[in-house]
Swiss-Prot record:
One of its GO terms (molecular function) is S-methyl-5-thioribose-1-phosphate isomerase activity. The record marks 158 as: Transition state stabilizer. This is Methylthioribose-1-phosphate isomerase. Catalyzes the interconversion of methylthioribose-1-phosphate (MTR-1-P) into methylthioribulose-1-phosphate (MTRu-1-P). The gene is mtnA. The lineage of its organism: Bacteria, Pseudomonadati, Spirochaetota, Spirochaetia, Leptospirales. Substrate binds at residues 49-51, 89, 197, 248-249.
Amino acid sequence: MSQPEFLPIQWKSTFLSLLDQRVLPGKKEFLQIQTMEETIVAIREMAVRGAPAIAITGIFGITLGAKKKSGNSNPVDVDSLIKQVFESRPTAVNLSFALKEAKKRVEGVSHWDSIAKVWESYALEMMVQDLKANQTLGKNGADLFPKNQNEFHIITHCNTGALATAGHGTALGVIRSLRDQGKKVVVYADETRPFLQGSRLTAFEMMEEGIECYIITDGMSGWLMNHRKIDAVLVGCDRVATNGDTANKIGTYNLAIVAYEHKVPFYVCATKDSFDLKLKTGDEIPIEMRKESEVTQFDFLKNEEGNFLFPEGKTSPIGARALNPSFDITKAKFIKNFITELGCFVPEEISFRLKNV
């Protein structure tokens, strides 16, 4: 039976209410986003994250920007709003596609009030479409699993649930759909360093819904595949090139290689907006580099007073350097299938499946 889901993005007509994912699971706190500038900070600082959720939030952000203006618009100012939001997080293609569509929808619209209404309507439309796409994707993915098997053990990476989308989720959407079909699902959630989206967010979502879940460290998947029967690895993604190379949260590539070695099917769950047919291979996907302090002191984790839980020198020597790419590229050869709202298909079929969409 379907369970209630989170609504991490809520539009309140004059402001945007965002569930602050930086403070989960400690507390459920909503940010009241009043301006485009606050939206950009929320995206950049990962109060909201996940490619679909970022895209929706970005369109609400430019809506807020337009609402603060008055009189007649001009193309330069419209482009400025769009450019500022785009630069908040460049890897996920969903945001880029959404902003291009937003620009197209206001061509010939000359008043800021009218532009704000067009963008507000578009953002609300995106929320409905994303939820519907995720629910269809989830069912398509669930149908890949054997009907005569009642229990499945699945590894996930990062957070790909309702918190990362308008609802239901992509990879976690498949898990929810299996649950709704009456199957027992045991989830092994990679903690996903350094931002800990798996241990903080995926485990939180699964526990809220009563789905059995174990947190594992990012280096534990090989041991797990050797010692327990793993039926599949399910991940989301931020951008897919034409050849199937896939950008996703750092650590995905490692997990794909381990799954390949152990003959565990590795599935990428993505809505059509995550496919970028302008890019031939993953080498063309830009990789966002984030702050070193996210690695050396978990600087996104703060106590009630707003102070760092792990001050400098606590988890790494003071002055230690770190690399912090937010994403890596998983080569297409490690991916068994893409699970989408359009159906499930192998990397070689991407051009055929997406060219007329």
